[in-house]
C-alpha cells in the first residue's frame, strides 16, 4: 500500500550555491538520490511553498524545502522469525541491541536473514513504513543500540532529528596504538577511489565529525569512547584509520594485529583471533518522536569485547605501561 509522506527541512547556509537535487539529497539522506530526483521532476518538491521541478536550480540557504509524495514499497521483504534483543518498545518506536554478524538491511549478497526481516516478523506493521522503520544502521559486525520507527510519523521525525544532529550516539572501541589524548576528527567521507565497498576521507565526500576520548590505556592499544555528530557509512572506522589508530580486528581499514613485546600466548591468541572490529554502540539518547520525552538507553559491552579488554588490561598490569603515558 502506498504511504503518503511529508518531509520538511531547511537548506543550510553551507549549501549556498548547491543544485537543488544535490541539496535535497543531503537534507533527506534517508532516501535514495534517484527517488528524490524522481519526486523533484514529478512536482512533489516545493521551495518556500513554490513547486520547483528543475534539478539545476540553485539554493541560497535558508529556504524551506518540503516533499509531498507517495511512497510505494519497491520490494516486499520476507518476515523471518529471527530473535531480537529488545531494549525498549512502545507503539511508536523500538530500540534493539544488535549482535555481531547481523546485517541490518537486505542487499547484494545478503537477501535475507537481516534485522529488517526480523523486524517484519516481530512487528508486521513496519511493512507500511519506509525501510521497515530503520532510521540508522550499524555495520554487520558492529554491535549495540539501534532505534527503529514503527510508524511513518515516528520515522519522519526521527530522521529529521538525526539530520539536525539531535540524536546522541556513543560508542566504545579498542583502537590500535598508543593514544595519549582525545579530540575531534572533522574530515569528509566518501566512497574509496578504488575499493568500492569501502569508504575513505575525501575532499569530495560528505561532512563527517567524530569526537573521541581516551578511556583506558594498554601497552599497544587504547580503549576509547566516541560520539558521532554525523552518521556516514563506516564513519568511526574510517576516521580512526585516518588517525593511524584503526580499530582492533578491522582488517578492512588497517586494523592488523599488533602484539605487545613479550606478550603471553593467551594475549597473543586473543589479539590475533579477534575477528571483527572492536566497536560497540553503547549509548543512544533522543527525544521521543511522538511524546517528546527525553529517552536514554545503554547496552552493556558484549562478551567478546569484555574478554578482549580484560586480557589487554592483565597484560598491561603484568608488564607495565610505556613511559609516554
From Swiss-Prot:
Cellular location(s): Cytoplasm
Molecular-function GO term, any one: RNA binding
Keyword Cytoplasm: yes
Alphabetical keyword list: Cytoplasm, Isomerase, RNA-binding, rRNA processing
One GO CC annotation: cytoplasm
Reactions catalysed, as given in the entry: uridine(1911/1915/1917) in 23S rRNA = pseudouridine(1911/1915/1917) in 23S rRNA
PROSITE patterns membership: PSI_RLU, S4
EC numbers for this chain: 5.4.99.23
Active-site residues per Swiss-Prot or TrEMBL entry: 139
Domain S4 RNA-binding: 18-91
Isomerase among keywords: yes
Entry-linked InterPro entries: PsdUridine_synth_cat_dom_sf, PsdUridine_synth_RluA-like_CS, PsdUridine_synth_RluC/D, PsdUridine_synth_RsuA/RluA, RluA_PseudoU_synthase, S4_RNA-bd, S4_RNA-bd_sf
Annotated GO biological process: enzyme-directed rRNA pseudouridine synthesis
Alphabetical list of PANTHER family matching this protein: MITOCHONDRIAL RNA PSEUDOURIDINE SYNTHASE (PTHR21600), RIBOSOMAL LARGE SUBUNIT PSEUDOURIDINE SYNTHASE D (PTHR21600:SF44)
Task performed by this protein: Responsible for synthesis of pseudouridine from uracil at positions 1911, 1915 and 1917 in 23S ribosomal RNA.
Family: Belongs to the pseudouridine synthase RluA family.
NCBIfam families in the cross-refs: PRK11180.1, rluA_subfam
Stated name of the protein: Ribosomal large subunit pseudouridine synthase D
Organism the protein comes from: Vibrio vulnificus (strain CMCP6)
Gene encoding the protein: rluD
Amino acid at each position: 500500500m502506498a504511504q503518503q509522506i511529508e518531509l520538511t527541512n531547511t537548506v543550510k547556509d553551507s549549501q549556498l550555491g548547491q543544485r537543488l537535487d544535490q541539496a535535497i539529497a543531503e537534507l533527506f539522506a534517508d532516501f535514495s538520490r534517484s527517488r528524490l530526483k524522481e519526486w523533484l521532476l514529478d512536482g512533489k518538491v516545493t521551495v518556500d511553498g513554490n513547486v520547483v521541478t528543475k534539478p539545476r536550480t540553485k539554493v541560497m540557504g535558508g529556504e524551506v524545502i518540503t516533499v509531498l509524495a507517495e511512497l510505494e514499497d519497491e520490494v516486499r521483504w520476507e518476515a523471518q522469525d529471527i530473535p531480537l534483543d529488545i531494549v525498549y518498545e512502545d507503539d511508536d518506536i523500538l530500540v534493539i541491541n544488535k549482535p555481531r554478524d547481523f546485517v541490518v538491511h537486505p542487499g547484494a549478497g545478503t537477501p535475507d536473514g537481516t534485522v529488517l526481516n526480523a523486524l517484519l516478523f516481530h512487528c508486521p506493521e513496519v511493512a507500511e513504513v519506509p525501510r521497515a522503520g530503520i532510521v540508522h544502521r550499524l555495520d554487520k559486525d558492529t554491535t549495540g543500540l539501534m532505534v527503529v520507527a514503527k510508524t511513518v510519523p515516528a520515522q519522519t521525525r526521527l530522521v529529521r532529528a538525526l539530520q539536525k544532529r539531535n540524536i546522541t550516539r556513543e560508542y566504545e572501541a579498542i583502537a590500535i596504538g598508543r593514544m595519549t589524548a582525545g579530540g575531534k576528527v572533522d574530515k569528509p567521507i566518501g566512497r574509496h577511489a578504488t575499493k568500492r565497498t569501502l569508504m575513505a576521507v575525501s575532499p569530495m565526500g560528505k561532512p563527517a565529525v567524530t569526537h573521541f576520548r581516551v578511556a583506558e590505556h594498554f601497552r599497544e592499544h587504547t580503549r576509547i569512547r566516541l560520539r558521532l555528530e554525523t552518521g556516514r557509512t563506516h564513519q568511526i572506522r574510517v576516521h580512526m584509520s585516518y588517525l593511524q589508530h584503526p580499530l582492533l580486528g578491522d582488517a578492512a581499514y588497517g586494523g592488523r594485529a599488533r602484539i605487545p613485546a613479550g606478550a603471553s600466548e593467551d594475549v597473543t591468541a586473543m589479539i590475533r583471533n579477534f575477528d571483527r572490529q572492536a566497536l560497540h554502540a553503547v549509548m543512544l539518547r533522543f527525544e521521543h518522536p511522538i511524546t517528546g520525552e527525553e529517552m536514554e538507553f545503554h547496552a552493556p559491552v558484549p562478551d567478546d569485547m569484555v574478554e578482549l579488554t580484560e586480557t589487554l588490561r592483565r597484560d598491561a598490569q603484568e608488564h607495565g605501561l610505556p613511559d609516554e603515558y
